């Protein structure tokens, strides 16, 4: 009996392992937070969040406790809140509105001020993202000027486009299309064009300013930035004969400064007006708090920036332009 017992204990078969406890394989966002839209500076509210855990054995544990990781307060760069449980994470996407784009700064909430010298005037705006208001919910100084001063603004603006006619929907292409359209205005009180920040990425296409006697639109090389500017000015004079204003952004880089310098030569040749936000030191003296409120990035203003910072500059320039 003893011999049999010992032989039985010497079996070479492996001892069967007990099944391991299931572990968390991944987290599932079962229910989003009740509020996902915020203005920067607010605090995220996790009310409504439900997180489930899918286990390694295929089962699901519902409504697991989680730790929350999120910027407090929320910033313009906050993309999501992170829920963490047992080494796994799941994200709640957030949509953060810049403080300067809060509804209180919208054109809809801009008060009309009667008696403006710009009331009833028709202005044509040609530009790209800054003229469009790409970082301000599609609202720019043109929209605020129309609302406050009672002006009529035609805003021809497409983000990412250039003055130089080397890409689709360039300033030149769109302006020519408008001039050929059935709805082309017969009279414009002033023409305002953006010195595109997109052209600064193509310094090889800046070109040169033409001689004093070169005035016909067909004489200019529109594939060059400076040629396109002169072509546009010549066409405006030919079609409408109205004041022409070009506006320049606050300081950016050396390439943009080269463009500003070229525009100044062109302005002297053609007698056009520059809305100069590049060299205006007093205009650019902002506190960090103001800059954060007024600018979405180095190039694009927020609603508050257009309304409270840029608009008075354009009102002053346009009042001068339309003055009898």
Question: Residue spans of the language-model regions?
Answer:
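Serine/threonine-rich, repeat-prone extracellular segments and beta-strand-based repeat modules
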Residues: 59-90, 94
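Catalytic His-Asp segment of secreted/periplasmic serine-dependent ester chemistry enzymes
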Residues: 251-324
């Amino acid at each position: 009996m003893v011999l049999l017992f010992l032989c039985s204990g010497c079996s070479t078969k492996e001892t069967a392992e007990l099944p391991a406890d299931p572990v968390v394989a991944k987290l599932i966002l079962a229910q989003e937070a009740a509020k996902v839209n915020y203005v920067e500076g607010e605090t995220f509210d996790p009310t409504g969040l439900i997180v489930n855990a899918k286990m390694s054995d295929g089962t699901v544990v519902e409504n697991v406790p989680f730790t929350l990781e999120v910027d407090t307060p929320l910033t313009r760069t906050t993309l999501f809140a992170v829920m963490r449980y047992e080494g796994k994470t799941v994200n709640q996407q957030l949509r953060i509105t810049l403080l300067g784009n809060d509804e209180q700064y919208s054109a809809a909430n801009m008060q009309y001020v009667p008696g403006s010298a710009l009331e009833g005037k028709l202005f044509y705006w040609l530009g790209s993202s800054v003229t469009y208001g790409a970082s301000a919910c599609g609202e720019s100084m043109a929209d605020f000027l129309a609302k406050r001063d009672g002006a009529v603004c035609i805003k021809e603006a497409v983000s990412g486009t250039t003055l130089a006619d080397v890409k689709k929907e360039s300033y030149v292409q769109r302006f020519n299309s408008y001039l050929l359209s059935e709805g082309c205005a017969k009279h414009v009180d002033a023409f305002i064009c953006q010195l595109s920040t997109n052209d600064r990425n193509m310094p090889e296409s800046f070109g040169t300013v033409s001689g004093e006697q070169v005035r016909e639109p067909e004489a200019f090389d529109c594939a060059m930035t400076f040629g396109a500017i002169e072509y546009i000015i010549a066409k405006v004079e030919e079609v409408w004969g109205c004041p022409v204003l070009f506006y320049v952004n606050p300081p950016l880089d050396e390439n943009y400064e080269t463009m500003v310098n070229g525009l100044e030569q062109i302005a002297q040749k053609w007698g056009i007006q520059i809305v100069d936000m590049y060299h205006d030191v007093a205009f650019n003296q902002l506190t960090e708090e103001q800059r954060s409120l007024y600018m979405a990035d180095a190039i694009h203003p927020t609603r508050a920036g257009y309304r409270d910072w840029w608009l008075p500059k354009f009102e002053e320039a346009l009042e001068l332009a339309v003055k009898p």
